[in-house]
Amino acid sequence: MWKKRAIIWLCLCLAGLMVLLARLTQLQIVATEHFTKREINLLEASVSQRSQEMILDTGRGNFLYKDGTPITHQSKPVLILFPFLKKMDWDSKRISEITGVSEYALEYAVEKAKKPFAYGEPNPIELTKPQMEKINGLQIPGVFAVEKKYHLVQNPAEHLIGITGENETLLRNRYPDKELSSQTMVGLTGMEKSFDEFLLPDGKSKLVYHVDATGGPLFGINVKYVEPANPFYPVNIKTTLDPNLQTVVEQLVDQHGIERGGAVLIDIETNSVLAMVSRPAINKDDPFNKENGGTENLMLKEQIIGSVFKTVVTAAAIDYELTNPSRQFDCSKTITGEPDPLFQYGMLDFSTSFARSCNNTFATIAKELKEIDPNILGNYAEKLSLTGSVGWIGDIYHFEDFKQLQEDKGRIFLSEDAKKDNNFVALTGIGQHEVRATPLAVANMMATIARGGTKEMVRVASKVEYKNSTSLLDFKEQEIEGDTLSPYTAMKLQKLLREVVVNKNGTGRSLQDLPYEVAGKSGTGETGRTLGDKPLYNKWFAGYFPFDKPKYALVTVRLGATGNTSSASPLFADIVKEIYNHDHSQN
């Protein structure tokens, strides 16, 4: 009997050992980086448990203004102190003399510290180069003067640049073949998302020391400096943004109380974005809550553009010879032919109709174009780069059709039947019904007209640079494929857009006295939404300047505004003034 019991006992012991061995194999070999449903990385957890570190740079790539200055971060020379200093006699007096910080303050900060820190955080004291050299020359263990990268609390162009975050599931799905730490930051929106694979870190720069269970040094007081071995990484994305103009436009958008909307400024020569601002601002505590602002860049989302679309109707009307100067339109009537209770403009020619934005004129023209060919308005919207992708797209390395921007494409009609319906076509002719376009596309339309009809892709980045500032790749200027306006039609549009401003009754007459001569078009899109009993509108002004030698295309828009809210023209005017001052301060 005892033999049988012994055998059973031995079998149980062997089974237990096998279970333990299987568990140990799972922990140390099979699931070291993806343990349990929570996907715990045991290697990282082990290192974290027995060491403390001060991250100086996450290693993720950076975004730069066109002049090379950083947009999203700032490197500061700071004083790093390690908590094990409290257990040793260190020369706090000498550090005090060099930094100007009291000896008591230094020792008190170390005493309450549980991990390495930059003295003075969240607003650390910034050291001079001589101070850094003196501190490091003392060679005090646990005391370092180093450069540490800080992300700016208020990022300019925050919607355009986008945000990052830790999301291991997204990381594994996006890069299944890459060996990346579970704590690797990934781009979630904007350019951070578009350029994410370029920006992935090669490793962190950090100060590390090993600790025992009490937090004391495990292997003496040696602190290791760890940095990526590749001197070319991380790479930087050089944007086309101008630091001064971006700052000015941000300030003016806020000064004008734009709650929803913003502005887009394009360099016409290179067709590059110089400034882009979207409001509401991103709520850092809850960025994806749309009620608190959300992360959507409204300058890249399709919007109702109202009378701005009359520019497209006009281009088609010019080519199909529907703008005879002797022709008169009844601008005291609505688009249905009924007497207009609000606007009694009388009989106007086409040029004056455009300047005063007469709805009946453009509803009539749109219906006449429909009789010639129902596709004309859609075709001309494409010719003016108002619809379709307008951001830079191209093949680079192993990326096919790499897109710098995540943008809506806009639309004119939703169905073939709508193109043939007189009522829908009349509404389309004045930029209502289903007409949608992004503010970026509207700005690009103005740039296209100012260039004489050549339509180009809009760039927000000019190149990807290695860490040492040498070029990895360039995003060259590229034209958009497809039909274009003739130079003659573009010239006629230029004159009509200028008439909007110089005509004493033009909708842009408030812009007559600006230091730069402006050409452009206003728009008031009916959203179909209300605030209480008040209808809400999208208020636009889109144009370019200087008129004789076009340099800038600008769109300002106030979205979802009540009728008594200011138009977008005052913001447009103030931006033009500041750009004029900027240009002449450099001369």
What are these regions (language model features)?
Residues M1-D285, G378-K383, L559-N587:
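Periplasmic/cell-envelope proteins involved in peptidoglycan metabolism and beta-lactam response
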